[in-house]
A protein has these predicted regions:
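Specific transmembrane alpha-helical segments of multi-pass solute transporters/efflux pumps
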Residues: 1-4, 34-80, 116
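Juxtamembrane helix-loop-helix junctions in multi-pass membrane proteins
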Residues: 1-25, 69-75, 152-160
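Transmembrane alpha-helical segments that form core, pore/gating elements
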Residues: 3, 25-30, 87-93, 125-160
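Juxtamembrane helix-entry segments on the extracytoplasmic side of multipass membrane proteins
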Residues: 10-19, 38-44, 119-149
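Specific alpha-helical transmembrane segments that line the substrate/conduction pathway
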Residues: 16-27, 65-96
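Hydrophobic residues within alpha-helical transmembrane segments
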Residues: 20-24, 47, 51, 82, ...
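Transmembrane-helix signature of multi-pass solute transporters
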Residues: 24-32, 59, 86-90, 109-116
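Hydrophobic transmembrane alpha-helices of multi-pass small-molecule transport proteins
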Residues: 29, 48, 99-122, 128
Length: 160
C-alpha cells in the first residue's frame, strides 16, 4: 500500500494521488459489494469509525505524498507502523484488556524493531533521522499522528 500511494502521489501530487486512489477504491467497492445498508449500522460506530478512518487515511496518504524522497516515504511508512503497539496499549488503557508484566518488554521490543528497520543496513543514526524530519516535518508528523488515530480506531470500533 505504501508503494502504491507513493507512486500515484509522485504522478498526481499528494492530494490528487490520495483522491484518485480512494475515489477508485470507492467505485470498486460499490460495483463489487454494493451500497452499504447505513441504517443497520449503529450511529456511534458509523460516526466514530468514519471520522477516525477517514482521518487516518488522509494522514497516511499525505504523509507518504509529502515525503521528500522515496527513502523518506519508507521511513514515514515505518513511523506509521507504531500503530500495532499503540493499539495494544490503548486496548489495555481504554478497553480494560487484561495483561501481565510481559506486555512491557513486548511493547519495547516492537519499538526497537521499528527503530531497527528505520536504521536499515547502516544502523540507526539519529543525525540522519533528525535531518529527514527537519526536511519533511509535515510528513513525519502526519505519519505519527496517523499511528495514534489508527490505534484509536481499532480501540473504539472494537467496542461495537
Amino acid at each position: 500500500m505504501v508503494g502504491l500511494i507513493r507512486g500515484v502521489s509522485e504522478g498526481l501530487g499528494p492530494v490528487g494521488g490520495a483522491a484518485a486512489i480512494y475515489s477508485l477504491s470507492g467505485l470498486l467497492l460499490i460495483f463489487t459489494v454494493g451500497f452499504p445498508r447505513i441504517r443497520q449500522i449503529p450511529k456511534g460506530y458509523l460516526l466514530a469509525g468514519s471520522l477516525l478512518f477517514v482521518s487516518y487515511e488522509i494522514c497516511l496518504a499525505l504523509s507518504l505524498g509529502y515525503a521528500a524522497t522515496r527513502h523518506q516515504a519508507i521511513e514515514v511508512g515505518m513511523v506509521n507502523y507504531l500503530w500495532p503497539s499503540l493499539t495494544i496499549l490503548f486496548a489495555i488503557l481504554f478497553n480494560g484488556q487484561k495483561t501481565n508484566w510481559l506486555i512491557v518488554p513486548g511493547l519495547l521490543l516492537a519499538l526497537v524493531g521499528v527503530c531497527w528497520v528505520l536504521g536499515g543496513d547502516n544502523g540507526l543514526h539519529y543525525d540522519e533521522i533528525i535531518n529527514n524530519i527537519t526536511t519533511s516535518p509535515l510528513s513525519y508528523f502526519l505519519a505519527f499522528i496517523g499511528a495514534f488515530i489508527w490505534a484509536a480506531y481499532c480501540t473504539v470500533t472494537n467496542k461495537y
